[in-house]
Amino acid sequence: MAFRQHQLPEESSKECESNPRYRAVFISDLHLGTPGCQAAALLEFLRHHTCDSLYLVGDIVDGWQLRRRWFWPQLHNDVVQKLLRQARKGCRIVFVPGNHDEFARAFEGHSFGGIQVVNEAVHTTADGRSLWVIHGDYFDGVIQCAKWLAYLGDNLYEFSLKLNRYLNSLRARAGLPYWSLSAYLKGKVKKALNYVTDFEEAVAAEALRRGHQGVVCGHIHRAEMREIGGVLYCNDGDWVESCTALVEHRDGRLELVHWHKQLAGGFTAPVGQEVSA
């Protein structure tokens, strides 16, 4: 896949110094290559959240949608260039492909522009906890057993996102904050809630079986951090609806960052859900 070369403006040293440097940042489900990707918000997040290690936890590029219709605006190219520049500056970037960018799984063990490609990873926090890092689609029965249904669901989801963008354009004109229609609908549908619960419990159980204290995943576009059966389950959310990420502070504390809420509040200090050892 060829990307146009475009030089991003360098962040000022003053801006970089004013932001804390995190030990690790986890993001997933960017879905670059789709109109739903909130690339502008993501770029702003990356500028304010420098880190030692950055984990790209799957569905970074949406190969499913790009095969149907090419969509690659300059902002999406800027995100790729930003990631490559972070790698050049010494940030360790690990890419764990998901089902929408499963083509990258064939390149496990390779490095492109300083970005390592692995099908799963293990991250050890500063306080010694072992976190299993996976996208999570292997625990999705629809993906594994009825991929045609997954493609159908993807089309319906894309339609809901188009409606979501229209509604939020009206809300913006009225001075109202961003609101996710699809997230609201998922929260109201009992079957969707059962699916999420089953997914979370299955992922946590496998992490425990493998001897890890926690797991970081994506896939279901639902940011969460809670204990499940003695395992810390972390889902870093997505950059289509919620604009969320998981960060590790220098002392090993984990925090879910809700970037939309921070922007709405003027971005003064990190806020989110934290879990301490």
Predicted segments, located by residue:
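Core catalytic region of metal-dependent phosphoesterases/phosphodiesterases
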Residues: 2-3, 17-23, 34-126
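Long, positively charged, glycine-interspersed low-complexity recognition regions
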Residues: 3-4, 12, 238-277
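Short, basic, glycine/proline-bearing loop/turn elements
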Residues: 23-31, 65-69, 184-191
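Residue-level marker for buried hydrophobic side chains located in beta-strands
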Residues: 24-26, 54-56, 132, 216
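Active-site glycine-centered loops adjacent to acidic/histidine catalytic or metal-binding residues
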Residues: 29, 58-59, 98, 135, ...
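Short glycine-/acidic-enriched loop or helix-start segments at secondary-structure transitions
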Residues: 65-67, 105-107, 143-144, 225-227, ...
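Conserved beta-sheet core of the metallophosphoesterase superfamily
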Residues: 113-120, 132, 137, 141-151, ...
